[in-house]
Each structure stands twice: as C-alpha cells, then as structure tokens.
Amino acid sequence: MKNTQLPAHSRVVKAHGAGNSFVVATDQYDDYDPSEVEVATLCSPAFGIGADGFIRAVERDGLWFMDYRNADGSKAEMCGNGVRVFVDHLRREGLVDLPVGQTLDVATRGGIKRVTPESEDEGQGASYRVDMGPAASPARETIEVRVPGIDAVLGGIWVDMPNPHTVVELADEETLRGVFLPPVDVSQIPQAQRPFYDPAPQAGTNLELVVDLTEPGAERGHIAMRVLERGVGETQACGTGCCAAALATALRRGPGAPTQWVVDIPGGRVIVGLDGVIDWSGESPRITDASVFLTGPATRVAEIRLP
C-alpha cells in the first residue's frame, strides 16, 4: 500500500504559470498517493503552503506522469499552466535533459501532452509551448448560464480540453471586472451566489468569462478572461480555460476569425494557437482533430522543506 502522506522533512516546490500556482512534489518511484485531505491542506493558504493545485511528478514506463490534483484534493484530467510548471520542475531538478527547442512527452490523465521550452528563465520565468491535443465542442452555444450580478441569461459554449469548460462572452471589461467570482469552490458558498447552468454539466465545469478585445483587421485575436475553476474557485489563470476561451471566441466571430489569440488573465498573458482547429467549410463550423497550442511562462517561487 502506498503512503497517503508525504514523508517527514520532504522537499516540495512552490511555482506558478501566469499566476496559476502549484505545490510540486517529486515522487519518481511512485511511492506516494496523497489523500484528498492532505492535498487540500497543502493547498490551503491558511493551513498549508497555499496553491491552486498540487502536482506529483512520477516516472512510469519511461514517461513522466503529471499527477494533478485540484486544490480540494480531487483528481483532474489536465492543467495547461500546470504542465508547463511540471516540465520546468523536471528540468530544474535535473530529472530530464531538455534543451530549448526540444520536446518532451508528458503523460496526463487527459492523454500525452508534448511540451517544448522556448526560452530560459530571464527573471520572469522560462517560456514553454504545449501541444494540448485536440479540443472537443459542439461549436455553438448549448448551455444557458446565469451569473450572479448579471440579469441576462447568457449563452455558453461547451469546450472539452479534456477537462470541461463553459465559455460565456460579456459585453465589456467593466462588466467583467464587476462580476463576483468566489475565491473558493462553489460548493462552499450559498446557492444564490453560484453560477447556474441549464443543462447542468454532469461532471461539473470550469466557467470562463470573456471579453473580445480584438481590433478590426488585427492578425491576432485578443481577449480578456476571468475563470472560476471547478474544485478551486477563481484563479489568476487557467491554461486549458484560456484555450477553451480562445476557441469559443473564434467560433463566435465566425469564418475569418484569427487563429492566434492573446489571452490576458489576472495573472499575466498567454498565447493560444488554433491553426486548423475549426473547419468552416460546411453549413456549420466543426472542430477538427488538429491540436490546440498554448504558450506561456513557468516560474519557480520557493523551495520548501516540510516539518
């Protein structure tokens, strides 16, 4: 039976990707399976280190596996900002030899993700490009969403990255700034303060609130986004959410929409690539098997020795 707690005096790392923060632990030989309680405690800013999620680095069958947990301890399919932090951790710890421009395959619950370092750390984190794999979406608004503080019923586009996302477009940045998003999982707040979905996603959903800032004729799209993460609350960034938000905004724009998107989140900026992801040739758009790409920073904050 595996240990459910980190051994005494274990060393962990605090790191972030565009403000999306993580506690990272190396468990190369797969000796440790953390309980939900331990993960939630480590991620608690009051009782632990404080983070949006927990990452365990495990080597299995010649591949590095990113065991990602939400801040409440629940297991998640993937984390786009987390996978950059994960590979940055492997490089800094000397667990892989991965020069700039070379690619590493990373195993996740959401499949293999290919990660390429694009630059070294120059004070604001090293930059990594992630092949996030294909998205899945009905490519239209299929969910009605009510957001506390906004009177209107909003249309949501469902995107699977492969974790679930519902993307809602707002009118302007003032509205985006004024929305209340809780800093904790919605299960911990009154029903009246929670977003409402119809139909309600069975496995829950991340909620992305987006404003399209794209200038007329611009080659790159530009959006501002806030995110309410499933099992966490509002975070400074969400990599898979940025991908979902860019894709949904492109779908709303229609044929001729940009395929490169700048995404501004509270924690910084990332770039999403959608080349070949949307097929506009039919009567309605279709999501192809082409990969979505995510580029952004990974920054180490601290090395911590547990008691």
Which stretches of residues belong to each language-model region?
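Active-site proximal loop and beta-alpha junction motif in alpha/beta enzyme cores
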Residues: M1-M78, V83-A237, A246-P307
